């Protein structure tokens, strides 16, 4: 197992524990981990679960989608900055 795979595995496991601790299925956690797309995003989700104690699956999924949207906005901003830097040089 590569170091990167190990990080992913550990982050996914933390999410599974957090989600099952509040009474939801491990399958939901696995799907969320895949959708979030990075260990840092997964850790943000785990932090949300521990702080907010969501009561419904909808609350979990809504936060997951918000995190994904923020990451996509950040990626687009970085791409735009890189394109602008290439254009200006």
Please annotate each region the language model reported.
Residues 2-35:
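N-terminal acidic leader/helix
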Residues 30-43, 48-50:
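Amphipathic alpha-helical segments that form the core helices of the histone-fold
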């Amino acid at each position: 197992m590569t170091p990167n795979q190990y990080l992913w595995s550990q982050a996914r496991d933390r999410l599974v524990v957090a989600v099952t601790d509040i009474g939801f299925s491990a399958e939901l956690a696995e799907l969320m981990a895949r959708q979030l797309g990075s260990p840092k995003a997964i850790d943000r989700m785990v932090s949300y679960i521990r702080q907010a104690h969501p009561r419904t699956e909808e609350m979990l999924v809504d936060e997951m989608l918000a995190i994904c949207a923020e990451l996509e906005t950040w990626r687009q901003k970085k791409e735009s900055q890189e394109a602008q830097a290439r254009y200006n040089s």
